Regions:
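Sec-dependent bacterial lipoprotein signal peptides
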Residues: 1-2
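Glycine-rich beta-strand-turn "strand-cap" elements at beta-sheet edges
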Residues: 5-27, 63-69, 100-121
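An amphipathic, aromatic/His-enriched active-site/gating alpha helix that lines ligand/cofactor pockets
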Residues: 8-10, 54-60, 79-113
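Post-signal-peptide N-terminal segment of Sec-exported extracytoplasmic proteins
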Residues: 22-60
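Acidic/polar helix N-cap motif
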Residues: 35-38, 70, 82
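A mature extracytoplasmic/lumenal domain signature
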Residues: 46, 66, 78-80, 90, ...
């Protein structure tokens, strides 16, 4: 497992964007399927994404987990203050660079799901 602990206020130099009353915090799961033998390369590339993403002011946590039974399967678990923070994340240069870096490592398309934090509804 590769993970970074969720950020606290002390870990960021910028305040998080204000959450509007009609918006909810968001959780993303992104399952990634890697070709056998490419796991170490993928983890190295993912560390860059984890580090940069956790610095985003709207990111509340960005972690990567590896399936212990199917070691070529990974899942990113991401938490954001709102949809605008996700849109910002998807528009960053390192997000696009990461997609290019791992394109030859993946065995199947990534499965991305976005959720509202239900307890806020």
């Amino acid at each position: 497992m590769v993970a970074c602990k969720p950020k606290t206020t002390e870990q960021t130099d910028k305040p998080a964007p204000a959450v509007q009353t009609t918006e909810y915090q968001k959780m993303i799961t992104a399952r990634v399927f890697i070709k056998p033998g490419k796991e170490t390369d993928f983890i190295s590339a993912a560390k860059m994404m984890i580090e940069n993403s956790n610095k985003e002011e709207g990111c509340l946590g960005y972690m990567l987990y590896q399936d212990p039974y199917e070691e070529t399967n990974f899942i990113f678990v991401e938490k954001y203050v709102n949809q605008a923070a996700i849109d910002f994340h998807f528009g960053t240069s390192y997000f696009k660079e990461f997609g290019t870096m791992i394109s030859d490592m993946t065995s199947n398309p990534m499965e991305i799901k976005i959720y509202d934090i239900a307890a806020e509804k």
